[in-house]
Structure formats: C-alpha cells, structure tokens
C-alpha cells in the first residue's frame, strides 16, 4: 500500500513538473519573441518568419527558412543574450530564463541544451543565420523529448490576450 502511494505521489509530482516546465517555456517563448516586429522591420524579414515563430513549438512543424535563423540572431542580440562573438552568453541566458520563471536547475539545463545543440550542429561559418536555425531545430527537438513544449492552446491564448 505504501509503495502505491509513493508511486502516485511521484506520478503527480512528475505531471506537475511537466506542466510547470511547459508554462515556463511558454513564458520564455513569449518574452523572447517580443522584439520580433522590430527585427522584422530592421532586417526587412518576410511574414513567413512570423508564421515560423507562431508554429515553433507545434510538433511536426518544420521550419527551414534562413530568415527565421536571422530573426533568432536579431532577437538574441536585442535581448543581450549573445557575447561579442555572437555566441550564447551562458550567464545572461540563465538570467533571462530565471527572470521568466525557470528555477536555477531548469535555467542551467536549458542553457546546456542550447550549448549542446550549438556544438553538435555543423558550423555554417559563411551563414550564421542557418547555424542559428539549425541550433533552434535541435533545441526544439530536445524540449519535445522532455515534454516541455508549451501547448499551442496556451501560446495562442497568450497571443490573443495581448492583442
């Protein structure tokens, strides 16, 4: 009887952790994308970039447009998440994650995932936008593996609430 209770407590805790993680990822995504319109104007990016961001967490949605990678770089720069070499600044990225709901462990895990994706994707030295796009694809896959991707209903609800 005690082991059944323990299993139930663990199962409930894991479900709450996943829901909390999805909520944090929703907050991070919404705040990361706030300067998107500025980046689109500054870089003359097409509306397809907005579509990619809108569908970013949708499972099975493939984004291949290098302009989306350029937008990711622009957003990261505007949010001061990059160092002088245009690489992720781990400390600032962890602070950004914590500011938007992640605890220390989750913030570190997110930055470690992005760093791992950056290391595992081939360098496109002649095209930093494609490198950013490939890192984003890898990161998205890792978030889905953890079941941390926010539901589309949550994201759409937030977007509609801000309009």
Swiss-Prot record:
Antenna. One of its GO terms (molecular function) is pheromone binding. Disulfide bonds join 39-74, 70-129, 117-138. Belongs to the PBP/GOBP family. Keywords: Disulfide bond, Pheromone response, Pheromone-binding, Signal, Transport. The lineage of its organism: Eukaryota, Metazoa, Ecdysozoa, Arthropoda, Hexapoda. This major soluble protein in olfactory sensilla of male moths might serve to solubilize the extremely hydrophobic pheromone molecules and to transport pheromone through the aqueous lymph to receptors located on olfactory cilia. This is Pheromone-binding protein. Residues 1-22 form the signal peptide. InterPro entries: Odorant/phero-bd_Lep, PBP/GOBP, PBP_GOBP_sf. One of its GO terms (biological process) is response to pheromone. It comes from the Eukaryota.
């Amino acid at each position: 009887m005690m082991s059944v209770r323990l299993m139930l407590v663990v199962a409930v805790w894991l479900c709450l952790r996943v829901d909390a993680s999805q909520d944090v990822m929703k907050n991070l995504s919404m705040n990361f994308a706030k300067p998107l319109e500025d980046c689109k104007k500054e870089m003359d990016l097409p509306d397809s970039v907005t579509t990619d961001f809108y569908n970013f967490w949708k499972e099975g949605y493939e984004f291949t447009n290098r302009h989306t990678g350029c937008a990711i770089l622009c957003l990261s720069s505007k949010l001061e998440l990059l160092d002088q070499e245009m690489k992720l600044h781990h400390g600032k990225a962890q602070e950004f994650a914590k500011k938007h709901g992640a605890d220390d462990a989750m913030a570190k895990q997110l930055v470690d995932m992005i760093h791992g994706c950056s290391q595992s994707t081939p360098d496109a030295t002649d095209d930093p936008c494609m490198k950013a796009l490939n890192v984003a694809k890898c990161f998205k896959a890792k978030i889905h593996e953890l079941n941390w991707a926010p539901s589309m209903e949550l994201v759409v609800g937030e977007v509609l609430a801000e309009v």
